[in-house]
């Protein structure tokens, strides 16, 4: 099901390189949402962003430690500059360690 009212919105997904949140990211991108994939493991975030972009979506990977305010501020600045301000937040960081 396509939700046209999501088209062009910006979603920020922490923990976006993981299994569950990467699924959220891909589903939102399929709805036309521009997705910022935040993850402590930037390589994992890049893999998800590359998959979304290759499928015709818009995604940006951002290496970010959600426990550090400086890291969050840098992420916010990058996202705002490249995608726009956040409309949707999915806070999935936390891991299974």
Could you tell me what each predicted segment is?
Residues 22, 26, 30, 46, ...:
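Amphipathic, non-transmembrane alpha-helical secondary structure
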Residues 20, 45-48, 52:
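Generic hydrophobic, amphipathic alpha-helix propensity
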Residues 10, 34-36, 58-60, 85-87:
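Structural signature of beta-strand start/N-cap positions in the alpha/beta core
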Residues 92-97:
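Conserved NAD(P)H cofactor-binding loop of Rossmann-fold oxidoreductase domains
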Residues 49, 53, 59-63, 68-86:
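Conserved amphipathic alpha-helix within the SDR
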Residues 31-47:
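Conserved glycine-rich Rossmann-like NAD(P)H-binding loop of the short-chain dehydrogenase/reductase
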Residues 4-36:
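Canonical Rossmann dinucleotide-binding motif of NAD(H)/NADP(H)-dependent dehydrogenases/reductases
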